[in-house]
Amino acid sequence: MPYLSTSDRIFFKDNGFLVKHDMLTDEQIRKAQSVIWDNLENETEVDRNDPATWLRDGPRTPSGGNHPDIVGTLMDSPVFSMVEELVGKDQVKPPGFCGPALNYPSGVSHWMPPEEGHLDYLPPDKENIGFTIGGMIYVDDVSERGGGFAVWPGSHLQALSLFQEHANDLDQLEGLDAMDLVPETKPQIVWGPAGTACLWHGNLVHNISKNCSDRIRLALIIRMRHMEFDRIRNDFTGDPWKHWEGIRQL
């Protein structure tokens, strides 16, 4: 039985992201938290039992992304199956790494959404850092102003339109900044309880938001590629969803 409804897939196609809750068991959450805290305490002066050590305003990335209890949040949960329901069964390379992505409390109470976002890559992607679909998994509760992932709905369609326009001269896009796309929507913050997951299109404008809570945002970030990514990564001709089986079928 599929995890995603037709409405889910249509929402992803139109908005470039999809949020789902309750993707992890309590045991998966507990084990993932333990790995993150253990590595954080080994590598920094942060003490999980002393919130005064958590005020480090900004993102941090401890090690542990290849630990089985971290990778299992993707592969042993519904999340990777949902990825395949969008891109295609056996069409996505299973990643062996899910990067811990932390956002420390800022220590201030005034919160505003981020003014700008970015793309992780732009074609022709000569540095080979691109990806097909991204995943963000929260392994602790994240409040609306708690440093959640920010996405600009529909900005992937603007990016794809631009890339199609330059499909035969992608070198012309070198040096372009994501904000040159001028997203037509305001950012939406992804927040929710531990076990919340967000999938997003590789060409969606996104960012991190300011953490005005008293908790470290504990999240995992994953960038996944189509099996034929090296061949198709700069193919922006024709149907932009031709390599997404779950979207092309709509």
What spans do the regions from the language model cover?
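Short, charged/polar surface micro-motifs in flexible loops or helix N-caps
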Residues: 79, 89, 105-111, 142-144, ...
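Conserved hydrophobic/aromatic beta-strand scaffold that supports enzyme active sites
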Residues: 17-19, 134-138, 151, 187-189, ...
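A short secondary-structure junction signal
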Residues: 112-113, 117, 127, 145-151, ...
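Short, surface-exposed loop/helix-turn segments at secondary-structure junctions
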Residues: 112-120, 169-185, 235-239
